[in-house]
Amino acid sequence: DRDYEDGLRYFQDKYPGTMAARIEFDPALSQRMYAAADMFLMPSKFEPCGLSQIIAMRYGTLPIVRETGGLKDTVIPYNEFTGEGTGFSFSNFNGDEMGDAVFRAARLFWDNRDAWNQLVTQAMSQDFSWTRSADKYLDLYFFMHPEIERPAAVVDEPVVCLLYTSDAA
């Protein structure tokens, strides 16, 4: 949305050295930005999966996301009463809610650095690996097929399966 882009550029010009906005994508710059930033704003209107918020969390950059698709599935909103969470979120696609989420994140950053650091640790410790995904898949599979007993041992070494299909009849 052009209005948001212009707004971000305005604040970049108003606060040089403190705030920066890059609308284009540059892979080399993106890694440096993830590593240097404290917060990562991802206000997607639609996002089937989203990797950027996962990358941000791995770097210790807390995501601020709109609750849609994979963003809602991967970012746990910060709960100031329990300390749980991995980032910040907002529900509706509008500037007021987005601004409120950014304000909540900034307030925590400036007013409670211990809670902020704990939230960063929680975000960085999230497991989005294939091992976790495969284990969830197996849980579902064995739940749907109770007649099949799930093996107790888990293999820590990689397993390679080769499937061969032949066109020959």
Q: Where are the regions a protein language model picked out?
A:
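Nucleotide-activated donor-binding/catalytic signature segment of Leloir-type glycosyltransferases, i.e.
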Residues: 2-30
